[in-house]
Amino acid sequence: DANAKGWDALAWNFRSCSGEMNKTLRFYHSGATDDLERVIEHAHQLGYQSIHLVGFSMGGNLSLLYAGRKGRDIPVHVKSVCVFSVPCDLAASSKRLAERKNKIFMWRFLKDLRVKIEVKALDFPQQVSAEDYHKIKNFQQFDDRYTAPIHGFDDAADYWEKSSCKPVLKDIRIPALLVNAENDPFLAPECFPYEEAKASEWLTLEVPKSGGHVGFIDINCDNSYWMERRVVDFVTAIIKG
């Protein structure tokens, strides 16, 4: 859809999420807006003067966090942000995922993360250990042991507080669309910022009844997904002014 309109798309992955592990001790986390900023700078250096951010899940949180942290100082070439299935409150979302009904999701996340930790332990044996990894049962335990110390946070609670986009939504100064499905199993009530959206002239919150977590399928006759079409419609409206 974007290419059909003459737009270029730049897709990027978090560190260690492309199928290849990065070489430094640091890898990815929800508050790493400096990585997003580098990608934006790269695109701008290539000559792009109108950049629209699109993200989902952790990437959605990162995009809103970037826009909120920048506030009025956001680069003029960053025009809008459109995000889906965003855990705006990381503490609340982590607790939701730790619930018994989400056990299968939690197991899958920790299984995937174990592979990354084992590689880090081989590359940085003095800083990272995979010993007793099987005892980790939720994100609080994982973030306390790995994410926080590796990336300079005091603990999981400190990481969640400083990396959640919800507290800075009020500071966003570019058009922003947040779409969180009512039936998203990963999102606690705190992840639906109704009051923040109501008080902001920049942030729009849409809460469809269905869609789950990044599951906005509804395939059209042209084989496009609803989520893709929503992005195109939103960005088109911004461009037209």
Annotate each predicted stretch with a short phrase.
Residues G47-I150:
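Alpha/beta-hydrolase-fold enzymes
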Residues K209-G241:
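Catalytic active-site module of serine/aspartate enzymes centered on a nucleophile-bearing elbow/loop
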Residues I172, L178-N180, D184:
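Short beta-strand/loop motif that positions the catalytic acidic residue
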